[in-house]
Structures are given as structure tokens and as C-alpha cells.
A protein has these predicted regions:
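A generic structural signal for ordered secondary structure
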Residues: 17-22, 304-312, 370
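Charged, solvent-exposed helices and adjacent loops that form client-binding or oligomerization surfaces
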Residues: 123-163, 167, 179-276, 299
């Protein structure tokens, strides 16, 4: 299965995506929220009401749930459901932008910075899951605080807020540890951050904004500033790149992979993975497509194939040489910028001629060939084969160790979120 947030491949039992650090499979912190009531408190004409007025006033200030009887005077928990709606006026968003709403170790998150995390979650969802939004009847142009998420309890605003806080929590924890161990960003990323203000100013001008500040306020809400956005980018890149550096070093041994599979053999079997499931193969390809489905067009396409074949055979015929030709000639938009790579191909994934070549007996790394499918001609380069059970166990084990990595880093820093102080400004979406 894949993470619904970053699309990374994850094990079906995963609770946290090792790539982005978010909770998956719909797992959420247990929640139970009730409706916030408002009350207008005035001076009572009957002296006996004054004590009740004081109680109600204190309740309003401290987050007590108000109702029509004393049974409703219960403290509302400082959690995601503290407010039915976190939306406030632009004036209040600006006034409270520097209020600290969360801390982790020595790091602080302000309302202004939270705006960035929140709206980035919304924009990412709209961009990547627009079809899902339609099927869920989510109208992102309407008030998200009045639309219920799929669990039947949480509002979409609360869902995105929780996602935003989890994103900050994960990135900030790794950014803190990166600072402690003296990790430095790769030069290209540091240069990007150093020049971010200037680049944002250019982007703002292109989009018709008077300044980068105006652009940020329009995109992230009235309570957000350019400084808030650049702070977000610094934490995001530092935390994410440090995490990916550590994650990339996870390299379980063959014995660990075998032991992990054996320990979870029942779970893998439920997914149809056994030690007799066959192989995955990785191949690179160069696709040349005919201009039309006619005999003349196919002949012209074959002529272009011969040109590429000649260049291939005149090279040293290494994988690097193949990569060069992929970049120059491949018409497969999906793989052209990844070296023409298809990974984890299983039987049944491709058209018959393509598949027969990939799974031919005694196929070896470095083998190459030419096949024709309904898409066109494919010049193929065989990279490797791996037993499906081994590949799935290795992936699952790396993800498990990645979750342990995330949990271990998060455990080092005390987290405190004050939902009572959180406010969100509106952004016009259409």
C-alpha cells in the first residue's frame, strides 16, 4: 500500500509513514468533542444570580463546556477538539500571530508559523487528492470547520490542523537533533534558503503582488508573515533532509531480513507473499512511440529505433550509457527522468512481450533487448531480479526501523500544544 500523504510505498501494517512521518491507515488519537456554547454575561437584577455569573465568566475564560444545567459545567480538554472552529477574523489572526501555541524542547511554534503548516497541508491535499476530495464531498472553498471528516467526528479543519501539528512535530524534532549533532545542509539547499527572500520577491512580482509579504498573507492567511514562511522552510528542510540522511543509512543484513520474514510469515501470507511467490525485476527502458497506429507510422518508428540501437551498440553498453540514451530519446514521460527505470515488476504487470522478456529463464544483469508492445518499441536493459518475499520483507523491515527512528527522536523532546491559543485565518480558495 501507499501513504495517503506522500505516496511512499509502505507496509500494510504500518502506523507511521517512514518517509513523511505522518500517521497512516486512518489511525488517529482517540477523540470525543462536544459543542462549544457561548453566553452573554450581564449584571443580574437578582442578587442570587451574581455567583452564577462569576462561574459562567470563569468557565468562558478557561474553556469550560457551557449548557443549560450544572451538569454541563465540565472542563473541556486541551486537545484537538477544544474548539469547534479555529477560524478567526483577520484582525485577531494578526494580533495573535506571535502567540506560542506549541513547544518542543527549546523550539517554539507560533500561530503565524502554524498557519504555514496548516495551509500547506490543505494545498497538498487539494493538489494530490482532488478526486478523493470529490468522492468525499469535501468542498475546500467552503468552511472546513463545518464539514465532517470520514471518521464522522472530526471536522476537516481539525484533520488538517492535526496533520499540520504532526508535520511540525516530526520536522522540528529532527531539526533539533540535527542542530545538536552539527548536521549541515547540503550546499545547494543552504544556498536556496539563503536566497529565499529574493526568490519569493521575484515570484510575488510575477504573480502580481506588491511584495513577498503580500503574497504570503494571501496564500497563508492574514496572521502569517514572510518571516513565518522562511522559518517554516528552514525547519522543514533541516528536519526532512536530516531524516532522509539517517533513513538512507538503514541497511538490514540478510539474516535480519530472513528473520523478519519468518517472524511475520503469517502476515505476509495474508498479503499473498510466500517464499514461492517468484521474483520482482527491475528494468530500464527507452520507449519510442509511433505517431499513429498505421503501418507507415510504425515503420517510421522502427527507423528511429534503429538509430538508437546503433548508438547503443557503438557505446560501451554500460548502464550509464543506457541512461544517457534514455534522457535523449525516451518518449515515456513517466520514467524519462528516472533513467527509464521500472522497479518491482511482477508477472502480470506488463504486456506479454515486455513481460516475457523480463522473466525469461537465465536473464542476467546487463542483458538488453528490443520488444514491441501496443505503446511502441521498447529498448530494454535488465538491472536485477529479487525474490518477492525478500523484497517485501526488506521493505517492511526498513520501514519498521524507520518508525523506530522517528519514535526514538520524538521521544527525546517534550511536546506541549496549547489548543486554547490556536487560531487560523481564512484564505480564499477557488
Amino acid at each position: 500500500m501507499k501513504c495517503q500523504f506522500c505516496n511512499a510505498k509502505i507496509h500494510k501494517d504500518a502506523k507511521v509513514c517512514p518517509a513523511c512521518g505522518k500517521r497512516v491507515n486512518g489511525e488517529k488519537i482517540p477523540k470525543a468533542f462536544s459543542q462549544m456554547k457561548s453566553a452573554a454575561i450581564g449584571v443580574g437584577c437578582i442578587a442570587g444570580l451574581s455567583a452564577l455569573a462569576v462561574v459562567l465568566f470563569i468557565a468562558m475564560q478557561t474553556g469550560w463546556d457551557l449548557g443549560s444545567s450544572f451538569d454541563w459545567l465540565k472542563p473541556r480538554a486541551n486537545d484537538l477538539y477544544y474548539k469547534d472552529s479555529y477560524t478567526v477574523s483577520d484582525w485577531k489572526a494578526k494580533y495573535t500571530r506571535n502567540d506560542v501555541v506549541a513547544t518542543m524542547g527549546d523550539a517554539q511554534l507560533t500561530n503565524g508559523q502554524l498557519q504555514v503548516y496548516y495551509w500547506m497541508q490543505v494545498y497538498e491535499f487539494v493538489e494530490n487528492y482532488s478526486d478523493t476530495a470529490i468522492s468525499l464531498e469535501l468542498d475546500y472553498t467552503a468552511d472546513l470547520a463545518k464539514q465532517i471528516y470520514t471518521d464522522g467526528k472530526t471536522t476537516w479543519q481539525q484533520f488538517f490542523l492535526e496533520s499540520a501539528l504532526e508535520m511540525w512535530m516530526t520536522n522540528q524534532a529532527f531539526a533539533l537533533q540535527a542542530q545538536e549533532v552539527g548536521y549541515t545542509l547540503p550546499a545547494a539547499y543552504q544556498s536556496y534558503l539563503d536566497n529565499l527572500d529574493a526568490e519569493l520577491a521575484k515570484d510575488a512580482a510575477k504573480l502580481g503582488y506588491a511584495s513577498a509579504e503580500d503574497m504570503i498573507r494571501a496564500e497563508m492567511g492574514a496572521g502569517c508573515s514572510l518571516a513565518d514562511y522562511t522559518a517554516y522552510m528552514q525547519v522543514y528542510y533541516t528536519g526532512y533532509l536530516y531524516f532522509t540522511d539517517l533513513y538512507g543509512k538503514i541497511n538490514p543484513t540478510e539474516q535480519e531480513i530472513s528473520d523478519y520474514f519468518d517472524a511475520n510469515v503469517t502476515s505476509f501470507a495474508k498479503s499473498g507473499v510466500t517464499k514461492t511467490s517468484g521474483n520482482y525485476v527491475d528494468v530500464r527502458h527507452i520507449l519510442l512511440v509511433p505517431s499513429a497506429d498505421t503501418e507507415t507510422a510504425w515503420a517510421e518508428c522502427r527507423s528511429r529505433v534503429d538509430t538508437v540501437l546503433q548508438k547503443w551498440q557503438n557505446s560501451d553498453m554500460t548502464e550509464l550509457d543506457f541512461l544517457v540514451l534514455v534522457e535523449q530519446y525516451s518518449q515515456d514521460d513517466i520514467t524519462a527522468y528516472t533513467g527509464g527505470m521500472y522497479t518491482n515488476i511482477a508477472k502480470g504487470d506488463m504486456e506479454e512481450t515486455f513481460e516475457n522478456w523480463c522473466f525469461a529463464e537465465n536473464r542476467q544483469a546487463g542483458d538488453w533487448g528490443l520488444v514491441q508492445t501496443s505503446y511502441g518499441y521498447h529498448l530494454l536493459y535488465f538491472v536485477e531480479a529479487e525474490a518477492i518475499w525478500h523484497a517485501e520483507a526488506k521493505t517492511a523491515l526498513i520501514q519498521a526501523q524507520g518508525r523506530d527512528l522517528v519514535d526514538g527522536v520524538l521521544a527525546q523532546y517534550a511536546l506541549d500544544v496549547d489548543y486554547r491559543k490556536i487560531v487560523l485565518a481564512e484564505v480564499e480558495m477557488g
